[in-house]
Regions:
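Structured interface patches
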Residues: 1-172
Length: 172
């Protein structure tokens, strides 16, 4: 059974140096504004796997894994999209170890799991959220969805006005 938490005190695990634990936790995940659109994780509480290891010289090595769907509009055609995002990230927090060995999600032995999950999801987002990879998007001239219109969808282009005088030429 999953525990419900977003702030987790690692000292409650009572790990000794070199010891580790794997936990299944439910974490609230906030939505994203991406490309001017709003995307919501579904479900709003993601089940995450947290692996915690106590390091020999103090501090923790952490691994976070989660998978969730994001619901929102396709960036190409505006139809509903629901891609699944998988996350597998690691953090190290070693007191006195310098900036590279200090996790921004740790305050002493307290881990802000919700912030870490949110940031990890944000970094795992694809360049475009689409309803399907083959989505052709919308016609830039009329706005029709190109997947529905088919390959025969075309528009006559207006002739370039700079060439207008050539149309006035009469050949006999």
């Amino acid at each position: 059974m999953s525990a419900r938490t977003h702030i987790f005190d690692l000292d409650t695990l009572r790990l000794t140096a070199g010891e580790g634990r794997r936990l299944s936790l439910e974490v609230p995940v906030q939505g994203f504004s991406f490309g001017g659109q709003r995307y919501q994780p579904v479900p709003a509480r993601a089940t995450v796997t947290l692996e915690v290891s106590r390091m020999t010289h103090g501090g923790y090595a952490l691994r976070l894994r989660l998978e969730t769907a994001l619901e929102g509009p396709c960036m190409r055609c505006l139809e509903p999209a629901s891609p699944t995002i998988s996350v597998d990230v690691r953090e190290v927090d070693q007191p006195g170890g310098g900036e590279e060995l200090t996790s921004p999600y740790m305050d002493g032995a307290v881990l802000d799991l919700a912030a870490w999950a949110h940031d990890a999801l944000a970094l795992a987002l694809p360049a475009q959220i689409v309803c399907r990879e083959e989505c052709a998007g919308l016609c830039p001239l009329c706005g029709e969805r190109l997947d529905d219109a088919g390959p025969e969808h075309r528009h006559e282009r207006a002739p370039d006005p700079r060439w207008g005088k050539l149309r006035e030429l009469k050949f006999e």
